[in-house]
Protein backbone atom coordinates (compact mmCIF):
# COMPACT_ATOMS: atom_id res chain seq x y z
CA UNK A 1 0.00 0.00 0.00
CA UNK A 2 1.52 3.30 -1.04
CA UNK A 3 -0.60 5.89 0.81
CA UNK A 4 -3.94 6.04 2.58
CA UNK A 5 -6.47 8.71 3.53
CA UNK A 6 -9.19 8.07 6.10
CA UNK A 7 -12.48 9.80 6.85
CA UNK A 8 -14.80 9.00 9.79
CA UNK A 9 -18.16 10.67 9.31
CA UNK A 10 -21.75 10.48 10.52
CA UNK A 11 -23.90 8.39 8.19
CA UNK A 12 -26.27 11.17 7.12
CA UNK A 13 -27.53 12.20 3.71
CA UNK A 14 -26.17 15.70 4.35
CA UNK A 15 -22.64 14.26 4.50
CA UNK A 16 -22.68 12.58 1.09
CA UNK A 17 -21.20 15.71 -0.53
CA UNK A 18 -18.36 15.63 2.02
CA UNK A 19 -17.75 11.96 1.20
CA UNK A 20 -17.68 12.69 -2.54
CA UNK A 21 -15.17 15.54 -2.06
CA UNK A 22 -13.00 13.39 0.21
CA UNK A 23 -12.88 10.51 -2.30
CA UNK A 24 -12.23 12.92 -5.17
CA UNK A 25 -9.39 14.72 -3.38
CA UNK A 26 -7.86 11.46 -2.16
CA UNK A 27 -8.00 9.86 -5.62
CA UNK A 28 -6.41 12.90 -7.23
CA UNK A 29 -3.67 13.03 -4.58
CA UNK A 30 -2.94 9.34 -5.20
CA UNK A 31 -2.46 9.95 -8.94
CA UNK A 32 -5.84 9.09 -10.45
CA UNK A 33 -6.79 10.99 -13.59
CA UNK A 34 -10.21 12.57 -14.17
CA UNK A 35 -11.90 9.48 -15.68
CA UNK A 36 -10.82 7.09 -12.91
CA UNK A 37 -11.58 9.68 -10.25
CA UNK A 38 -15.08 10.27 -11.63
CA UNK A 39 -15.87 6.54 -11.73
CA UNK A 40 -14.61 5.95 -8.19
CA UNK A 41 -16.41 8.98 -6.76
CA UNK A 42 -19.74 7.87 -8.26
CA UNK A 43 -19.28 4.26 -7.11
CA UNK A 44 -18.35 5.37 -3.57
CA UNK A 45 -21.31 7.77 -3.51
CA UNK A 46 -23.68 4.94 -4.45
CA UNK A 47 -22.16 2.70 -1.77
CA UNK A 48 -22.34 5.38 0.93
CA UNK A 49 -25.91 6.27 -0.04
CA UNK A 50 -26.90 2.61 0.36
CA UNK A 51 -25.32 2.51 3.83
CA UNK A 52 -27.14 5.67 4.94
CA UNK A 53 -30.55 4.91 3.40
CA UNK A 54 -30.81 1.12 3.55
CA UNK A 55 -28.26 0.18 6.20
CA UNK A 56 -28.85 2.65 9.01
CA UNK A 57 -32.41 3.54 7.88
CA UNK A 58 -32.37 6.94 9.55
CA UNK A 59 -30.74 5.69 12.75
CA UNK A 60 -27.49 7.26 13.96
CA UNK A 61 -24.27 5.65 12.82
CA UNK A 62 -20.94 6.28 11.19
CA UNK A 63 -19.06 5.36 8.05
CA UNK A 64 -15.30 5.00 7.87
CA UNK A 65 -13.90 5.52 4.38
CA UNK A 66 -10.34 4.66 3.46
CA UNK A 67 -8.88 5.55 0.08
CA UNK A 68 -5.53 3.99 -0.78
CA UNK A 69 -3.34 3.08 -3.69
CA UNK A 70 -1.72 -0.30 -4.26
CA UNK A 71 0.37 -0.40 -7.43
CA UNK A 72 -1.87 0.71 -10.28
CA UNK A 73 -5.08 0.25 -8.24
CA UNK A 74 -7.13 2.80 -6.36
CA UNK A 75 -8.91 1.13 -3.43
CA UNK A 76 -11.89 2.60 -1.59
CA UNK A 77 -13.01 0.75 1.52
CA UNK A 78 -16.23 1.63 3.35
CA UNK A 79 -16.77 0.28 6.88
CA UNK A 80 -19.95 0.62 8.88
CA UNK A 81 -21.99 -1.02 11.62
CA UNK A 82 -25.34 -0.81 9.84
CA UNK A 83 -27.56 -3.80 9.13
CA UNK A 84 -25.48 -6.30 7.14
CA UNK A 85 -26.15 -6.30 3.41
CA UNK A 86 -24.04 -7.86 0.67
CA UNK A 87 -24.51 -5.84 -2.53
CA UNK A 88 -22.54 -8.44 -4.48
CA UNK A 89 -25.43 -10.89 -3.91
CA UNK A 90 -27.95 -8.69 -5.74
CA UNK A 91 -28.70 -9.94 -9.26
CA UNK A 92 -28.26 -7.39 -12.03
CA UNK A 93 -31.43 -5.66 -13.21
CA UNK A 94 -33.02 -6.79 -16.46
CA UNK A 95 -32.32 -3.73 -18.58
CA UNK A 96 -34.52 -5.09 -21.37
CA UNK A 97 -37.58 -5.00 -19.13
CA UNK A 98 -39.69 -1.81 -19.41
CA UNK A 99 -39.10 0.62 -16.54
CA UNK A 100 -42.68 0.43 -15.31
CA UNK A 101 -42.36 -3.36 -14.91
CA UNK A 102 -39.06 -3.32 -12.97
CA UNK A 103 -38.76 -3.51 -9.22
CA UNK A 104 -37.62 -0.20 -7.75
CA UNK A 105 -33.95 0.14 -6.85
CA UNK A 106 -30.92 -1.88 -7.80
CA UNK A 107 -29.48 0.59 -10.31
CA UNK A 108 -26.95 1.99 -7.84
CA UNK A 109 -25.43 -1.44 -7.29
CA UNK A 110 -25.47 -2.03 -11.05
CA UNK A 111 -23.62 1.26 -11.57
CA UNK A 112 -21.10 0.43 -8.85
CA UNK A 113 -20.26 -2.88 -10.49
CA UNK A 114 -19.76 -1.24 -13.88
CA UNK A 115 -17.75 1.75 -12.70
CA UNK A 116 -15.03 -0.18 -10.86
CA UNK A 117 -13.10 -3.37 -11.57
CA UNK A 118 -13.89 -5.15 -8.30
CA UNK A 119 -16.61 -4.94 -5.67
CA UNK A 120 -16.17 -7.17 -2.61
CA UNK A 121 -18.06 -7.38 0.66
CA UNK A 122 -17.45 -9.14 3.94
CA UNK A 123 -18.26 -8.83 7.61
CA UNK A 124 -15.28 -8.44 9.94
CA UNK A 125 -14.92 -10.47 13.16
CA UNK A 126 -15.81 -7.24 15.01
CA UNK A 127 -19.16 -7.10 13.18
CA UNK A 128 -18.31 -4.31 10.74
CA UNK A 129 -19.57 -4.39 7.18
CA UNK A 130 -16.68 -3.85 4.79
CA UNK A 131 -17.29 -2.96 1.15
CA UNK A 132 -14.21 -2.60 -1.03
CA UNK A 133 -14.15 -0.94 -4.45
CA UNK A 134 -11.07 -1.40 -6.66
CA UNK A 135 -10.34 0.58 -9.83
CA UNK A 136 -7.22 -0.30 -11.80
CA UNK A 137 -5.37 1.76 -14.38
CA UNK A 138 -3.51 4.37 -12.36
CA UNK A 139 -0.23 5.43 -13.93
CA UNK A 140 2.81 3.88 -12.25
Where are these regions (language model features)?
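Conserved short strand/loop->alpha-helix "switch" segment adjacent to the catalytic nucleotide/phosphoryl-transfer site
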Residues: 17, 23-45, 49, 101-103
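N-terminal hydrophobic alpha-helix used for membrane targeting or insertion
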Residues: 9-10, 34, 69
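Conserved beta-strand-loop-beta-strand hairpin that lines the nucleotide-binding pocket
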Residues: 1-6, 52-140
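STAS-typified acidic loop motif
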Residues: 6-18
